[in-house]
Swiss-Prot record:
<keyword id="KW-0809">Transit peptide</keyword>
<dbReference type="GO" id="GO:0042026">
    <property type="term" value="P:protein refolding"/>
</dbReference>
<dbReference type="Pfam" id="PF00118">
    <property type="entry name" value="Cpn60_TCP1"/>
</dbReference>
<comment type="subunit">
    <text>Forms a single seven-member ring complex, in tight association with the p60 protein.</text>
</comment>
<dbReference type="InterPro" id="IPR018370">
    <property type="entry name" value="Chaperonin_Cpn60_CS"/>
</dbReference>
<feature type="transit peptide" description="Mitochondrion">
    <location>
        <begin position="1"/>
        <end position="29"/>
    </location>
</feature>
<dbReference type="InterPro" id="IPR027409">
    <property type="entry name" value="GroEL-like_apical_dom_sf"/>
</dbReference>
<keyword id="KW-0067">ATP-binding</keyword>
<keyword id="KW-0496">Mitochondrion</keyword>
<keyword id="KW-0547">Nucleotide-binding</keyword>
<keyword id="KW-0143">Chaperone</keyword>
<protein>
    <recommendedName>
        <fullName>63 kDa chaperonin, mitochondrial</fullName>
    </recommendedName>
</protein>
<dbReference type="InterPro" id="IPR027413">
    <property type="entry name" value="GROEL-like_equatorial_sf"/>
</dbReference>
<dbReference type="GO" id="GO:0005739">
    <property type="term" value="C:mitochondrion"/>
</dbReference>
<dbReference type="GO" id="GO:0140662">
    <property type="term" value="F:ATP-dependent protein folding chaperone"/>
</dbReference>
<comment type="similarity">
    <text>Belongs to the chaperonin (HSP60) family.</text>
</comment>
<dbReference type="InterPro" id="IPR027410">
    <property type="entry name" value="TCP-1-like_intermed_sf"/>
</dbReference>
Length: 569
């Protein structure tokens, strides 16, 4: 029988609740609203501050930026997104402008893994020129349309200009440029790709010596992470790390706590961490796993299986073979409730983030692994679609090639962290180059796209302004690189524009060269994403007419105390 409540009863209970929570102690602060040119000027100041800090890192003669940290030593870096994230301005309206450019760097980093400084350098002139033209009466919406029209044209030009990366030398060149000219890093990444393939798994870790090293470990990686952040156990970031762990596989969704309790008991009896990989988890079993992790301290983590349908089944079978586990599904009549010690796969190390899982040093039977590899090769010979071939090659790489680990050495934690930033940038840039090809570096590729903008036919004068804004922005990366090398950027750009299509400015040696032949190249994807993200956010920024912020919180005045005593002496 349902119990009905009348409104007086609900009101009284609500009042008691509010009284119990001391709602009067909560204070709701007013908002500050600013409009027009004044607030746009403040936002642009924030953009300038962030861009100034980021610009100095660009190019082979760019310098480092030091970030103070509340805990631990200061961080020294040339990584654009790291510098951008480290900026937090006191003025809230300036900070909004800075935050929007931070968003540009973050998006570029997520999509391409590199090019964050280029994105920041491009965002500033787009926002600045947009604001100036709006103050003269131009329509911000039409300006944005012109900007996006020009960007689409540039992207087409970059695609036509792009050349595929085929050789190990080209891979090394891309990695070297992205690592700020460090040839040792370029060679290290090229060697890693030669060992595990262009699409192989490569990770970066702290080394234990003064030198950088390459280690090849047999392992598997897939794009699914932990189901809940409550499983995180690492103090080096939001990730789960276990050694000598057991792995349990299930193709089906886990609905009941009774399905996971036997596995927990077995893992606990062996005093080993437990990794469960299943299609999905209902609330009850997930709660049991989280509570056992938090309250009892059992080392356990739940992960969703990768893919769907037949691909998920094959991926789990591959993992089970590589780790020596039993795959639970309907065909072999194995249930999670009936799992035994032999049901578990075993790995020497497991690293799990919110987006990926890496199983290292699997202890599977070599004969079973070879059978899986042979089976995949047979399927590869008969595959007809490119999609199926890509999936099969991906599975083959996981089973056959293993994982390349780049161990970065140095004299101190500060030095190692700075070098790791450059290695990660170089690795991401190299992957992007393999994916979409390369274009002349040093800002030359963007300069070669300017003539195509002259052929565009904008619908009105305000759209023409948007196109001209992009023309000016495309010159900025080359200008910045030359300026950081101590030369007049405008003069350098003028000379490069009069040269052949593959020529540009070598800032390291102060000479004009064929950029492709000299190995000064940029991944097409990095340049494309930098321009796309910068123009999208910066042009949206110019369309803002009002900004709303919280007003500064007023501190309560100190209590007034009566004087002690008070009598006459």
């Amino acid at each position: 029988m349902f119990k009905m409540y009348r409104s007086p009863h609900i009101t009284r209970n609500s009042f008691k609740y509010l009284k119990a929570t001391n709602i009067n102690s909560c204070r709701f602060y007013a908002k500050e609203v600013r409009f027009g040119p004044d607030v746009r000027s403040l936002m642009l100041q924030g953009v300038d501050i962030l861009a100034d800090a980021d610009d100095v890192t660009m190019g082979p003669k760019g310098v480092n930026v030091i970030l103070a940290k509340n805990l631990g030593p200061p961080k020294i870096t040339k990584d654009g997104v790291t510098v951008a994230k480290g900026i937090d301005l006191k003025d809230k309206f300036q900070n909004i402008g800075a935050r929007l450019v931070q968003n540009v760097a973050n998006k570029t980093n997520e999509e391409a893994g590199d090019g964050t400084t280029t994105a920041t350098v491009l965002a500033r002139p787009i926002a600045k020129e947009g604001f100036e033209n709006i103050s003269r009466g131009a329509n911000p919406i039409e300006i944005r349309k012109g900007v996006m029209l020009a960007v689409e044209s540039v992207k087409r030009q970059l695609k036509e200009m792009s050349k595929p990366v085929n050789t190990s030398e080209e891979i090394e060149q891309v990695a070297t440029i992205s690592a700020n000219g460090d040839e040792s890093i370029g060679k290290l990444i090229a060697a890693a790709m030669n060992r595990v393939g262009k699409n192989g798994v490569i990770t970066v870790k702290d080394g234990k010596t003064l030198e950088d090293e390459l280690e090849i470990i047999e392992g598997m990686k897939f794009d699914r992470g932990y189901v809940s952040p409550y499983f995180i156990n690492s103090n080096k970031g939001p990730k789960v790390e276990y050694n000598d762990a057991l792995v349990l596989y299930s193709e089906k969704k886990i609905y009941y706590a009774s399905q996971v309790v036997p596995a927990l008991e077995l893992a606990n009896s062996q005093k080993k961490p437990l990794v469960i990989i299943a299609e999905d988890y209902d609330g009850e079993p997930l709660s049991v796993l989280v509570v056992n992790k938090l309250k009892i301290g059992l080392p356990v983590v739940a992960v969703k299986a990768p893919g769907f349908g037949e691909y998920r089944t094959n991926a789990l079978l591959d993992m089970a073979a590589a780790t020596g586990g039993v795959f639970e599904d309907d065909t072999n009549l194995v249930r999670l409730e009936d799992c035994q010690a032999e049901s578990f796969g075993q790995v020497g190390e497991v690293i799990i983030t919110k987006d990926s899982t890496l199983l290292l040093k699997g202890k599977g039977d070599p004969n079973e692994i070879k059978q899986r590899i042979d089976q995949i090769k047979e399927e590869l010979e008969t595959a007809t679609s490119n999609y199926d071939r890509e999936r099969l090659i991906d599975r083959l790489g996981r089973l056959q090639s293993g994982v390349a680990v780049l161990l970065i050495g140095g004299c101190s934690e500060v030095e190692v962290n700075e070098k790791k930033d450059r290695v990660n940038d170089a690795l991401n840039a190299t992957r992007a180059a393999v994916e979409e090809g390369i274009v002349p570096g040093g800002g030359a590729a963007l300069l070669r796209c300017i003539p195509a903008l002259d052929l565009l036919k904008p619908a009105n004068k305000d759209q023409e302004i948007g196109v001209s804004i992009i023309k000016k922005a495309l010159r900025t990366p080359c200008i910045t690189i030359a300026s950081n090398a101590g030369f007049d950027g405008a003069v350098v750009v003028s000379k490069v524009e009069d040269m052949g299509p593959e020529y540009g400015y070598d800032a390291l040696n102060n000479e004009y060269v064929n950029m492709i032949e000299k190995g000064i190249i940029d991944p097409t994807k990095v340049v494309r994403r930098a321009l796309t993200d910068a123009s999208g956010v910066a042009s949206l920024l110019t369309t803002a007419e009002a900004v709303i912020c919280d007003m500064p919180k007023q501190k309560d005045p100190p209590p007034e105390y009566a004087p002690i005593g008070g009598g006459d002496y």
